[in-house]
Amino acid sequence: MMISILLVFAVSTAYCRDYGREMRATRMSVVDFWKNETKGDGLNVRVAHGVNSWPDLVDQLHEPFLNKSMMIEGDVFMQAHRRPRHRAVPVMKADTKLADRITFKEWLREVATMNKAIKINFRSNEVVRPVLQDLYASQADPTSPVLQYPVILHANVFRSPRSVETEVDPSTFVEKAKDLFPDATLSLGWTKQSNFSHLHPKFKKLSWRQLFHILEYISRLDQPVMLSVRLSVAAHSKEQLLWLLGMDQSISLLLWSDAEDHVTNWTPIVELRRSTTKNRILYDLDPKHRKFLQTDSNEPIATPPTFSLQDWQAVEFSSSGSQLSTVVRSEKGPAFLGEPTALLLSKIPPPNFPSEQKISGKVHFLPKKGMENVDLDENSGVSIYLMDKVQDIDSPKIKNSLEVFIGFDGKIKITNGQLKNLPYYETKSVGQLPDSDCYGFEVTDMGWRVKLDAWTAECGNQKLRKRRTVSIELDTPFQKNRHLRNVVVSKKGDSAVDFLLEELQHKNAYNYRNPWITVVSTILLMIYLL
């Protein structure tokens, strides 16, 4: 009898779980869902803020048709009862003068029938689990209205300078949302702050280090992610935001503003708006800011990618550490984070001799916060391997291969790891560049020789004093099948030094050099093969 009861309970639980997963909210963006009304432009989305009380809900039912909001926003927090035996419940953050607050369950039941997108703002750590449990239970309950419109779960998880509120723990928020409501869009933002207009300009931008910190929470999520960014911050963070939008996963932005936002240079915002598809950015702006963008041109502009997602395959190995160790790909370049456990394999087949191949790019080194003055592994940097067989790779540590290395401290070298009873070849060639955060490079593989040209490069808004270039080369054994080598890119050395390849290209180029040089190269190859 007991076994039968347990079986029935297990089956019913599984049924509810499957039912809930089938009926969860659509993953479509708000812009795509209201495509006819918005004309595919996130600037045309109308948001109803602070719908937290019964009167607010009634107003939503009677709003003018031509000015109808497309998304309802509500704020949830925990209300504790005076009597300890009564547990705290999630309620909406309405005017404190109201005697009876509306609970989150009641609010959800009402807004689910209004045919609008729903944005739920989590205002504390305590409210995360119970609200997500209510959302899950509502979709597993056949009597509850089905959420057929986009649902956005928002929390301010990053602390701002001069913050006036406590941030929600990002790990708890992301993990609970992934487990209990995986089809919602996760929205991450920064805490509210006082006197924003008086902040130093350095606090009004999103740095690359901050961006990498964000990746720790979103890089492995399967569900859509939205980053809520202040307009003034976005105006100074165009490159970082374009990099995020270029990731090979569903990432969008919500740009918001209030009266404290004073934008003096609109060019980055306009370029951001015109450089991406219009449905990737939502705008929740102060009327004066919205009016400016509505009058400005929004014709798309072509921004060629600096990295082809189709040409490179990511291969990851497990890491023993707790920190994020991976490679995150974007059309604006790949980022290598944490331990050196990830590789990028070029899908472009190596050419035949006498053709040559080139690997070019720009690397931006970013030591983790607080690690700038610590003694770091001198072998930390980016490695480009030229390999005969990529099928032999069974770990992130590649051996018996030709390696081209650019270090974070400016050290460059070419190492010949293929030498076996070949005393006529040098083992390595080394060089040194001046200290810089960014270096440009071009590797030329001619089959019998590899050359590296490397130089100091500009980083962001930092002006380069003088470009310095160093070139090194190394003669290498040549394969008897006349194929050049496969290309693999990886991180090497210390986990405290992350880097972004702002540019990375692999090209096969036919040899257009002097014909006599080609003839001599062919003769040398024939002698080697004899």
UniProtKB/Swiss-Prot annotation:
Its main location: membrane. It comes from the Eukaryota. It is a peripheral membrane protein. Keywords: Cell membrane, Membrane, Neurogenesis, Secreted, Signal. The keyword Cytoplasm does not apply. One of its GO terms (cellular component) is plasma membrane. Disruption phenotype: RNAi-mediated knockdown results in reduced arbor complexity in PVD neurons. RNAi-mediated knockdown at early L4 larval stage results in terminal branching defects in PVD neurons. RNAi-mediated knockdown at the onset of adulthood results in defects in PVD dendrite structure. Residues 1-16 form the signal peptide. Belongs to the menorin family. This is Menorin.
